[in-house]
Design a protein with these regions (language model features):
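ATP-dependent adenylation/nucleotidyltransferase module used to activate substrates
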Residues: 2-150
Length: 150
């Protein structure tokens, strides 16, 4: 993995920003999974004058899950390296267990339908991760898919 990857300590509280029409080379965070969507987003932002910075949540790996593919963090780091953009990890392992895995487990045991993506978005992506980005990197812009675009 690229030696430029750094861990960003997770800090609170959150704020949110939106994208302006004229980038002028401004840095903008792309939450990177290493998949096609986030990778293409980073490339398209570069192509339109933005200066994307990849950020990936470090989440716990489930013991014995038998996953043979590399973690998404590794994939994201390789994509960022290939694009020539910085990449950072935010350590979210403990909060992920407490705010996503445990509520999922409890809901499932109680016969309810868990909603782990909502919990992750609320407690990690747009709270813990974004705050770490703002405080540690000083970046004020986060790219998100415009409403109504699929």
């Amino acid at each position: 993995m690229n030696s430029d990857n750094k861990n960003i300590p997770a800090l609170f509280p959150p704020t949110f920003s939106s994208v302006s029409e004229d980038p002028k080379g401004e840095p903008i965070v792309v939450l990177m999974s290493g998949g096609v969507d986030s990778s293409l987003t980073a490339q398209l932002l570069m192509d339109t004058g933005w200066n994307p910075v990849g950020v990936t949540m470090r989440i716990p790996v489930v013991d014995g899950c038998g996953v043979s593919r590399r973690s998404c963090g590794t994939e994201a780091a390789f994509v960022c390296r290939d694009l020539g953009i910085p990449h950072y990890f935010v350590d979210t392992e403990n909060t992920f267990r407490e705010s996503v895995i445990e509520p999922f487990r409890q809901a499932y045991l109680n016969g309810q339908t868990p909603s782990p993506c909502v919990d992750c978005n609320t407690h990690l992506k747009f709270d813990l991760v974004w705050t770490a980005v703002e405080q540690q990197l000083g970046i004020q812009l986060l790219y998100r898919q415009p409403k109504g675009v699929e």
